[in-house]
Regions:
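Active-site neighborhood of HAD-like aspartate-dependent phosphohydrolases
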Residues: 1-39, 43-44
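Generic secondary-structure signature for well-ordered alpha-helical cores
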Residues: 16-19, 47, 142, 146
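Cysteine/selenocysteine-centered motifs that mediate thiol-based redox chemistry or coordinate metal-sulfur cofactors
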Residues: 35-56, 60
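C-terminal cap/substrate-recognition subdomain and adjoining C-terminal extension
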Residues: 51, 55-178
Length: 178
């Protein structure tokens, strides 16, 4: 979803609004350098969002910049009978927004914990990382009776590699260097 279906990284948008953009960027850089794994870096970045007002999520969701051609791609796939899914290490709140906007069939992402209208800095449930994306892709294919060889997956980062490796066609879109 982030930097693929949409042009931005939502966690960076949230961090900027929370006044912790530089701190989050530094943690992201450490993760890119291999100093932190995805789950550790995700939890560390998320903790910095503690106290962010829930209204910020709605504002960001309403202004998500879709990647060029995203609407046409999804509508064409839907018209041709394809099933579509968002499997994201980002946030469910924004995936669900895009699901309504574009008619996506499935959304699996991290659920932000919100209490009393504020982000707690924690996520509910398991973190959607690379291995979880792979499991979810296989689950959807099985549920829809689609052979993995017939699956197309699109991703941009190292945490997409497990998912891309099991798809019949794995596409690196705006890929980050490994």
């Amino acid at each position: 979803m982030d930097s693929t279906l949409i042009k931005t990284e939502v966690i960076d948008e949230l961090a900027a609004r929370a006044g912790v953009g530089e701190k989050v960027a530094a943690i992201t850089e450490r993760a890119m350098q291999g100093e932190l794994d995805f789950q550790a870096s995700f939890r560390e970045r998320l903790a910095l969002l503690k106290g962010l007002d829930e209204s910020v999520l709605s504002d960001i969701a309403d202004n998500l910049p879709l990647s060029e051609g995203a609407e046409k791609l999804i509508s064409t796939l839907k018209r041709l009978g394809y099933k579509t899914a968002i499997l994201s290490g980002g946030f469910n709140y924004f995936g669900k927004h895009l699901q309504k906007l574009l008619g996506i069939d499935y959304v699996f992402a991290n659920e932000l914990e919100i209490e009393n209208g504020k982000v707690t800095g924690r996520v509910k449930g398991d973190i959607v990382d690379g291995l979880r994306k792979k499991e979810l892709l296989k689950h959807i294919a099985q549920k829809e009776n689609i052979a993995l060889e017939q699956v197309i997956a699109v991703g941009d980062g190292a945490n997409d590699l497990p998912m891309l490796s099991v798809a019949g066609l794995g596409i690196a879109f705006r890929a980050k260097p490994l």
